């Protein structure tokens, strides 16, 4: 899996915006990626040093549209903590 395929998109919410002050950045990542792969991908793409990676898995939710039942996509979210002195890569 390529590094650019692991990181899907940044997650911009009120909580993630508050965590940016503490050098914590949130991303949606591929569901098959592990913490080591996520760390290597972030360091390679953004040229920063990663201190720690926390990962959360979200199950698919059952949804109904009219008479049809289906599921939302499952997803995996990673909170990446940068080392002190790293460059702020969203600015």
Swiss-Prot record:
Coiled-coil-forming residues are none
Q: List the disulfide bonds.
A: none
Q: What does this protein do?
A: One of the early assembly proteins it binds 23S rRNA. One of the proteins that surrounds the polypeptide exit tunnel on the outside of the ribosome. Forms the main docking site for trigger factor binding to the ribosome.
Q: Which GO terms describe its cellular component?
A: ribonucleoprotein complex; ribosome
What family is this protein classified in? Belongs to the universal ribosomal protein uL23 family.
Matching HAMAP family: Ribosomal_uL23_B
SUPFAM superfamilies documented for this protein: Ribosomal proteins S24e, L23 and L15e
Organism from which the protein derives = Macrococcus caseolyticus (strain JCSC5402) (Macrococcoides caseolyticum)
Q: Which GO terms describe its biological process?
A: translation
Q: Top-down, what is the taxonomic lineage of the species of origin?
A: Bacteria, Bacillati, Bacillota, Bacilli, Bacillales
| Subunit structure of this chain's protein | Part of the 50S ribosomal subunit. Contacts protein L29, and trigger factor when it is bound to the ribosome.
One Pfam family recorded for the sequence = Ribosomal_L23
* Alphabetic keyword roster: Ribonucleoprotein, Ribosomal protein, RNA-binding, rRNA-binding
Q: What is this protein called?
A: Large ribosomal subunit protein uL23
Q: Name one GO molecular function term.
A: rRNA binding
């Amino acid at each position: 899996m390529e590094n650019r395929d692991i990181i899907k998109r940044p997650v911009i919410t009120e909580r993630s915006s508050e965590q940016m002050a503490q050098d914590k950045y949130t991303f949606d990542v591929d569901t098959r990626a592990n913490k080591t792969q996520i760390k290597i991908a972030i360091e390679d793409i953004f040229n920063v040093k990663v201190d720690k990676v926390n990962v959360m898995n979200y199950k698919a939710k059952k949804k109904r549209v009219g008479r049809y039942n289906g599921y939302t996509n499952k997803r995996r979210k990673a909170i990446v903590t940068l080392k002190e002195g790293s460059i702020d890569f969203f600015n």
